[in-house]
Amino acid sequence: LEEYIYLGAHQGKVYKYLLTGELSIHTQLPTSASVISILPSVAGLIYVTDSDGFFIRDSLGEIRHVMLDSLSLLKDKNIESAKITCGDLLWLVHPVPGVTLFDLKTQRLSFIEGKDEQGRPLNTESDFCF
C-alpha cells in the first residue's frame, strides 16, 4: 500500500510526497497562481488556486480549468480557502463577505452573503458550518 499526500505550491505545481520520504512532481497546472487546496470530490481531484479559480482532474486524468474571473456572479476572484461538502458542493471563501458555492454535478455557481445576529457580514470559514 503506497501512502502519500499531495502538496500544493507556487506557479501551479502540485507535488506528491510519499511517506517514505520521496518527493516528486505530480502535476504542473497551466497557471502562475499558488495551489492552496487539493480536495477529493465526486468529479475527481480539485486543485484550488489563490487567484486563478480551480482545476478539476477527472478519473481519466483530464484537467479542466474553471476561471472565476469569467463568472459575473463572483464578488472576488481571490480565494482564501476551500471546502467540499457532501462530495459535490465546493465552498470558496474570499476576502469579501460571503462565500461562493460551485455545484460539481450541475456546474452551477451561486453566492451566499450572510449576516450574523448583529448584522455583521459573514466571510470566514468559521462563520459557515461545513
Kindly give the residue locations of the regions a language model identified:
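Carboxylate-rich, polar loop motifs that coordinate divalent cations or form catalytic acidic clusters
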Residues: 1-130
